[in-house]
Structures are given as structure tokens and as C-alpha cells.
Amino acid sequence: MIDFDGLSNAFSGQTVLCVGDLMLDEFVYGEISRISPEAPAPVIAVQRSETNVGGAGNVARNIAALGARCIFVGLAGEDDAGARLRDTLSRERLIEPLLISDPARSTTRKVRFVSEHFSTHMLRADWETLAPASGEVEQALIDAILPQLPCADIVLLSDYAKGVLTTRVIRSVIDGARRLGKRVIVDPKSADFGIYRGATLLTPNSKEFTDATGRRADDQASLAKAARDLMRIAECEALLVTQSERGMTLVPGEGEVIHVPAHTVKVRDVTGAGDTVVATLAVSLAAGADWEAALRTASAAAAVAVAKSGTAIVTLAELRRNILPPASLAAEEKIARSAGDLDQHLTAWREQGLRIGFTNGCFDILHPGHVKVLTGARAACDRLIVGLNSDASVKRLKGEGRPIQNERARAEVLAALEAVDLVAIFEEDTPLNLIGRIQPNVLVKGGDYSLEQVVGQELVTARGGEVILIDILQGFSTTSLVKRAGGA
């Protein structure tokens, strides 16, 4: 069993130096509706499209999504795709992008046409320059990488064979890292593993492993033998073969072979899942995980990634929910830690077409009246967010001596209720700004308010939402409970 809380708490203190091939991933979703009258070719009725940072850039984004810092070195052309990638990466808080410009190179761009209903890929169009970086660009890459090695806890090379990781760049990075005692993970593309000589860990997939060995490995014994032959060539400490639905197998230089089965999930899209695996491995190993813990963490992350569409990242919260059994998930999982955390929940729920409800209050001493309103609110929606006044806000509204319980305690009590899906603490006297951010489908308050008195009702109804008043339970109020307790 992984001590995931202990491991993940160390993620934010790690820095990963990631070097590799950057690309722009575009997804065009739609359905084939007819055959073109111009030629015997299908016509795709486009419904939506999205753009993501791909290749080694997706590795960097997955590192950052786990809370670690990433120094990313890559290559981009002086074109529209390159400009879009630079802009996107510059806005990533935990990524420091060091992108070398190459005017002679087209930025790698992949456009995938995907069935919206079936999630199957129908066609892919690529724009790319496969030639290795020129000598001048090679030197610029090396000059950008070497000064960053002392800052890194671990180094990750993400090779997509698009020109960045030339033999000279690879050797400069691995040799430099070894002189400083830094571990190096390589996600290889070349069938010649000798060019990665001296790396700590190589992570080929099944096809890359077969290409490098020249033979199939149909069982664990033959895989381990072939892996050790490769390890002698690469002079690496371990080799990990990722095998899609068959899981992943690590062959260490010393010790037993470790096999981790794949999680049983409905696969939506495998694009970028390998990026998620190597990113999670790098962060986990940097944080002190042993081989098995790192593998199990990476396998859990891959299961989250393949259940998403497009080039996906996996957040620390998503990973935690997949690793820990539901019974062990603390109420804190239902407390929004930041505006960004709130937005992630909202995005996920809206993608699923869920009806979002909102109610708010101080909830200083939870009583049956509160429970009635919360239960009624949850019955009117698919996901209920409770806005909770902060300690400072309660004090301004209720006076000295309040709140009785601090905001953290109040949030944990609310989060423990089955009716509550998320608690969001706000500092203002009213939740108007929070309602504007959430844009709920349903706004709920106790029936001691009139419709006109409900804060935010104009915002909700203007968007076609609904405002619901729930009859209060007479004889219960926090103020009266406090007075009665004080006189006892």
C-alpha cells in the first residue's frame, strides 16, 4: 500500500528539468454525416475543437499539475503554432519555459479528427520537421540546459524524434547530470538505446521495446531477459516497459522484476497517456518513492488520463481520488482550496452536463434546520456547492464572540454531509462574487427570505437559472442555540 499522502506532500518541493520535443495538439470533434459529392471521401460535420500543448510540453504540464516545478527546454519555429505554444506555456505558474527559436523549422502540429460520440480517431494531419536540430541550434539547446542541471532534483528526456534530442544533446545532458549526481529518466524513441547510455531509467512502450530488441517478449521471463540485454547496452539502472492494458513491467539492475497491472477503466482516449506516466514517475522518484511506489502511482495516473478526451493532464486531486479507497478520502477533498480548484470542479461537472446548485450561510453550529435546507438544495441539483462565510465575514455579520467554530471546522462538518459536494469559503459579507464565478443552475435559500432578498438571484435568473426557497424548520437557529448554551 502506498503512503500516498506522505509521498504527495513532497511533490511541491521538487523541480524537474524536462527536455524534449514540443508540439501543438489540436482535436476536431464531430461525426461523419455524408460522402462528399466532390470525391469519394467522408464529410465530417464539426461540432467543436480544442487545442492543447502536446509532446514534451504535455509532460511538463503533467509535472506542474502534480504540484511540482518544471523547467522546460524545447524548440519551436517562428510560426503561428510556435507563438501559441509560447503564449500558453508562459501562463503556466509552475513551468519555466526556455524555448529556443528555429526560423528554419516548422513547429510540430498534429490535428486529430475524432468522433464526438464514439471517441474514435478518424484521421490525423501532421505538420512537422523531422530533421535533427542544426549545429547552431544544438549548441543553443545545450547552453540553455546545462545551467539548469544544478537546480533540478531529477532530469527527464522526452524523445519524440522531432529534432531536439540529438545524440550530442542527449550526451551533454546525461553526462552533465551524472557529474552532479542527478538521476535521468528517458522516454525513448530511437531503437538504438546506446545513445541513452548512462541514464537511470528508460521507459519504452511495447512497440519501442520490440523495435530495440528485435524480438517479441510474450511473457515476463522473456521480457526480463530482453530488457537486461538492453540494459547492458544502455548502462542504465532499470528499464520500464509500458504495455497499455497489460500494465507495466520494471526490470531493475538488481532485485526482482516488478509488474503493476493496469487499472480497469473505460478508455476514452490514449493520447498523451505515456506523457502522464513519465511525468508521474519523475515527480514520484524525485519525492523519494521507491520503484514500486512510483510505478503504482504512475499506473493510477495513467488510468485517469485515458478516461479523458484529448491530450489530458492529471491533477494531484484526481490522482489522490484514484489511489485512495473512497472510505479513506477525508472531508477535505470536498473543500475548495483555491479559485483554481473550484474552477476545476466546475469544468469537470459541466463537461458531464450536470446541474449545479448553490446555497450559502455561516453554518456556525449545524442544526436540523440547516440539514433540511441542504438536503432540499441537493435534491434540486446534481452537484451542490455551499458558500461558507469566512471567520472575518461571520464576525462582521454576527458580532464579537462569533463564530463559535473557525472556518476550517465549519467547512469540514459541511463537507462530511452526503448532501454537500463542495464547500467554497468566501471573505466578503455576501456571496455575490462567488455566485458570479460559479454561475449555478439553481440558487437555494431558506424560506425566511423573500425572493427579492436572495443575494445573486438576478444573476441566476438572467442566465435562465432557477431560484428555490425551502421552508425553514421552526425553532432552530444558531443564534438561539448560542444564547441557550450561554445561559445553561
Swiss-Prot record:
Which E.C. number(s) belong to this protein?
A: 2.7.1.167, 2.7.7.70
What reaction(s) does this enzyme catalyze?
Answer: D-glycero-beta-D-manno-heptose 7-phosphate + ATP = D-glycero-beta-D-manno-heptose 1,7-bisphosphate + ADP + H(+); D-glycero-beta-D-manno-heptose 1-phosphate + ATP + H(+) = ADP-D-glycero-beta-D-manno-heptose + diphosphate
Pathway, per record: Nucleotide-sugar biosynthesis; ADP-L-glycero-beta-D-manno-heptose biosynthesis; ADP-L-glycero-beta-D-manno-heptose from D-glycero-beta-D-manno-heptose 7-phosphate: step 1/4; Nucleotide-sugar biosynthesis; ADP-L-glycero-beta-D-manno-heptose biosynthesis; ADP-L-glycero-beta-D-manno-heptose from D-glycero-beta-D-manno-heptose 7-phosphate: step 3/4
Residues at the catalytic site: D275
Keyword entries, A-Z:
ATP-binding, Carbohydrate metabolism, Kinase, Multifunctional enzyme, Nucleotide-binding, Nucleotidyltransferase, Transferase
Ranges for the region named Ribokinase are 1-330
PROSITE patterns xref list: PFKB_KINASES_1
In residue numbers, the region (Cytidylyltransferase) covers 358-488
Source organism, top-level taxon = Bacteria
A UniProt-annotated Pfam family: PfkB
GO CC term (a single one):
cytosol
Family classification: In the N-terminal section; belongs to the carbohydrate kinase PfkB family. In the C-terminal section; belongs to the cytidylyltransferase family.
What NCBIfam families does the entry give?
cyt_tran_rel, rfaE_dom_I, rfaE_dom_II
Name the job this protein performs: Catalyzes the ADP transfer from ATP to D-glycero-beta-D-manno-heptose 1-phosphate, yielding ADP-D-glycero-beta-D-manno-heptose.
Q: What is this protein called?
A: Bifunctional protein HldE
